[in-house]
């Protein structure tokens, strides 16, 4: 969907939309995900290429399966405010990639984009944000009186999810995987949680992270100026 793709670029990065507006207007509803990536690669703009790899025209919503858990709130959005079809997904980190692992087997042409989303949404120290959505990543804001407010900063399951995408892509088209290795088109998630130093971890191993409110405010200003790429 041309309009959905253009909307995706605008939300993620306003500057990229302004720079490549002429190219974006040439996209048609008949273009495939692969066509969009090829178009982006011709620009040799690494940020634009990253965005086009990240685009997946899915509609899906899921959080953790237990409805009694306090974080099990999510939207399944299928129509926009004009009652037109909406391509939108959201879910907790592991729920999204658990489902995409299975989806990649039935639709392997999306593997490059799924792998790109995984890599681009990890932090530099190997952790992950709380949620993945069509519009970008999200995290919990720490609330001193709410013990559930900062549960979403983990590195559990990281290796197995990545391994499965790599295995599937290697079997589907190993040439694509090899070419990815020297492409400078990936990013890190800039999550405002920080691991406490070693002495603090020893003092209280149940309280292992700090939330950087100043960093969070700075990121929010970047989002207003640039788009949700301000979280990277």
Predicted feature locations:
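Acidic, mature catalytic/reactive cores of soluble proteins
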Residues: 1-232
């Amino acid at each position: 969907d041309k309009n959905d793709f253009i909307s995706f670029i605008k939300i993620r990065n306003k500057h990229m939309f302004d720079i490549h507006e002429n190219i974006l207007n040439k996209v048609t509803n008949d273009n495939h995900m692969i066509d969009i990536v090829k178009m982006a690669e011709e620009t040799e703009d690494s940020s634009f290429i990253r965005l086009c790899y990240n685009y997946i025209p899915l509609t899906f919503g899921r959080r953790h399966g237990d409805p009694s858990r306090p974080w099990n709130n999510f939207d399944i959005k299928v129509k926009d405010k004009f009652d037109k079809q909406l391509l939108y997904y959201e879910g907790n980190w592991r729920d999204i990639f658990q489902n995409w692992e299975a989806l990649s087997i039935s639709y392997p042409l999306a593997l490059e984009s799924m792998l790109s989303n995984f890599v681009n949404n990890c932090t530099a120290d190997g952790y992950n944000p709380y949620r993945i959505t069509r519009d970008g990543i999200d995290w919990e804001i720490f609330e001193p009186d709410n013990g559930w407010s900062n549960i979403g900063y983990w590195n559990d399951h990281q290796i197995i999810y990545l391994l499965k995408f790599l295995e599937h892509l290697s079997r589907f088209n190993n040439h694509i995987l090899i070419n990815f290795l020297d492409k400078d088109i990936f990013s890190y998630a800039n999550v405002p949680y920080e691991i406490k130093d070693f002495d603090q971890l020893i003092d209280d191993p149940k309280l292992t992270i700090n939330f950087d409110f100043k960093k969070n405010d700075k990121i929010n200003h970047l989002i207003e100026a640039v788009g949700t790429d301000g979280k990277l």
